[in-house]
UniProtKB/Swiss-Prot annotation:
Ranges that cross the membrane: 11-31
A Pfam family hit: PsbX
Membrane-topology annotation of the record: Single-pass membrane protein
Gene3D superfamilies: Single helix bin
The protein's role, per its UniProt record: Involved in the binding and/or turnover of quinones at the Q(B) site of photosystem II (PSII). PSII is a light-driven water plastoquinone oxidoreductase, using light energy to abstract electrons from H(2)O, generating a proton gradient subsequently used for ATP formation.
Disulfide bond annotation, renumbered to this chain: none
Protein name: Photosystem II reaction center protein X
Family as reported in the entry's similarity comment: Belongs to the PsbX family. Type 1 subfamily.
Signal peptide as annotated in the record: none
Organism: Cyanophora paradoxa
Entry superkingdom: Eukaryota
Biological process according to GO: photosynthesis
Length: 39
């Protein structure tokens, strides 16, 4: 594997991490709030 390819894969991984973690945290937070409001 070339260094540019590994850097590309690395940036893809970090991009996924940076996007997915806040998104799932927000979804969890919203679903928890929604559950409280409905009951």
């Amino acid at each position: 594997m070339t260094s540019s390819l590994s850097a590309f894969i690395n940036s893809l991984l970090w991009g996924a991490i940076v996007v997915v973690i806040p998104l799932s945290a927000a979804l969890l937070f919203i679903s928890q709030k929604d559950k409280i409001q409905r009951n």
